């Protein structure tokens, strides 16, 4: 009899102390679009105008053009990465930017 009452008492304590699980509301976060990229330092560029066969050609020295191209590739990578990241989190909004 003592064992039965001990079992009933312990079951009563376990059931009596339990609570219903609280429902946690999941908040969706939509990150903002990144800030615009700053322009290339144009002071580094040395544009040149050359006239060849009566036609004017605008260009820059080879070393400057390579640095400029590296910067443009970095900009392209940055924009692609940011767009991919932001579109992943904003896919519920079905924006035209993310298609």
Swiss-Prot record:
Q: Which residues are exposed on the Periplasmic face of the membrane? A: 18-99
Q: Which residues, if any, are the signal sequence?
A: 1-16
Q: Which GO terms describe its cellular component?
A: host cell plasma membrane; membrane
Superkingdom is Viruses
Supply the alphabetized keyword list. Cytolysis, Host cell lysis by virus, Host cell outer membrane, Host membrane, Lipoprotein, Membrane, Palmitate, Signal, Viral release from host cell
Q: According to the Swiss-Prot or TrEMBL entry, at which residues is a lipid covalently attached (N-palmitoyl cysteine)?
A: 17
* Membrane topology, as annotated: Lipid-anchor
Q: Where is the lipid attached (S-diacylglycerol cysteine)?
A: 17
Subunit composition and interactions: Interacts (via C-terminus) with the spanin inner membrane subunit (via C-terminus). Part of the spanin complex which spans the entire periplasmic space. The spanin complex is composed of spanin inner membrane subunit and spanin outer membrane subunit.
What protein does this entry describe? Answer: Spanin, outer lipoprotein subunit
Q: What is the gene name?
A: y13J
């Amino acid at each position: 009899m003592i064992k039965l009452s001990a079992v009933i008492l312990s079951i009563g304590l376990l059931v009596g102390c339990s609570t219903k699980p609280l429902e946690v509301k999941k908040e969706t976060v939509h990150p903002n679009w990144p800030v615009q990229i700053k322009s290339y330092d144009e002071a580094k560029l040395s544009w040149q105008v050359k006239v060849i066969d009566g036609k004017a050609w605008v260009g820059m020295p080879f070393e400057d053009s390579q640095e400029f191209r590296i910067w443009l590739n970095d900009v392209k990578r940055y924009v692609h990465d940011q767009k991919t990241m932001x579109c992943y989190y904003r896919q519920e909004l079905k924006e035209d930017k993310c298609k």
